[in-house]
Amino acid sequence: MEMFNPPHPGEGVRAYMGDSITVSTLAKHLGMTRANLSMILNGRLGISASVAVKLSEAFPNSDPEFWLGMQVQYDLAQVRKKKRTKISPVLSKAA
């Protein structure tokens, strides 16, 4: 099975920012610290529901579900990449 490697949503934020919006400007506009926005942009911090709502308001051609969907896809891919003990079904098929 081929591994799906979705981008961190911070890459999507960068794309929406383009070259005309600075990190400081967007952070202030969203009411968050420059450090936290920078961590999102660099893939070190995830997007919460409240940040997703703010992003959808700042970039009206997006919606919160878009941002949270990117985050969920990224998170699931990270978990699937890790070596872990597989969990067996809790019920047998006969039940």
Regions found by a protein language model. Give the residues of each.
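Short, basic-rich loop-to-helix N-cap that marks the start of a DNA-contacting helix
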Residues: 44-58
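A short, Lys/Arg-rich alpha-helix, primarily the initiator
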Residues: 1-22, 65, 69
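Short, charged recognition helix plus adjacent turn
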Residues: 65-95
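Short alpha-helical "recognition helix" segments of helix-turn-helix
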Residues: 25-28, 37
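Helix-turn-helix DNA-binding elements, focusing on the entry/boundary residues of the two helices
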Residues: 23, 34, 48-52
